[in-house]
Amino acid sequence: MICIKNGWVHDAVHEEPYIADVLADNGKITAIGKNLIVPQDCEIIDATDKNVYPGFVEAHCHIGLDGSGIGFEGDDCNEMTDILTPQLRAIDGINPMDPTFREAALAGITTVCTGPGSANVLGGTFTAIKTVGKRVDKMIVKKEVAMKCAFGENPKRCYQDKNNYSRMSTASKLREMLLKAREYDRKVLAADSDESKLP
């Protein structure tokens, strides 16, 4: 158990920071308040004149997929075989030993939403993952949290030699995939739990 005492607490609830103690047990905050009563064996950290924040969440990054300092062997950010790859999952490519996880944790970032880059119109799913750990399956907060979709210059630049010269083409490819997804969803609903009728 740890008690961070007398710090300026920024709790994301109150508009202004306030001086208080923060009690944590096994990495989880259990109490916030002034002059908390703590067990005798509790580790005390004096935070007088210091700021105390909850862990930050990085909403969009490629940590664990872009091979920081490794080069080609660790670069799994973009799958360049097809402009549409919605079936790909970040969790299948994340390297938990990527040094950027430790760098993020040291900067106060406790959770990241990491996933594919923006080369593809649909690049695959992002995952929410903790920045501390050695096994991806033990670090996951939520397996699938977003689908990467890119309309900018990257699909044009990356696939110009494969018949994707304009944003019109990019939009057309996305529209085609969304129509397929809608039709698939319609068939699943029509099957009504009858596995023999599932697409």
Predicted segments, located by residue:
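N-terminal metal-binding scaffold of metallo-dependent hydrolase/deaminase domains
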Residues: 1-40, 50-52
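Conserved beta-strand scaffold positions in the cores of enzyme catalytic domains, especially
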Residues: 3, 42-46, 128, 146
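A short, polar/charged loop-to-alpha-helix boundary motif
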Residues: 39-44, 67
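Hydrophobic alpha-helical scaffolding
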Residues: 45, 87-90, 94, 160-167
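Metal-associated gating/positioning segment near the N- to mid-region
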Residues: 50-116
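Flexible loop/turn segments at secondary-structure boundaries
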Residues: 64-65, 120-123, 154-158
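Gly/lys/ser-thr-rich phosphate-binding loops in alpha/beta enzymes
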Residues: 90-148
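Metal-coordinating catalytic core of metallo-dependent amide/deamination hydrolases
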Residues: 128-199
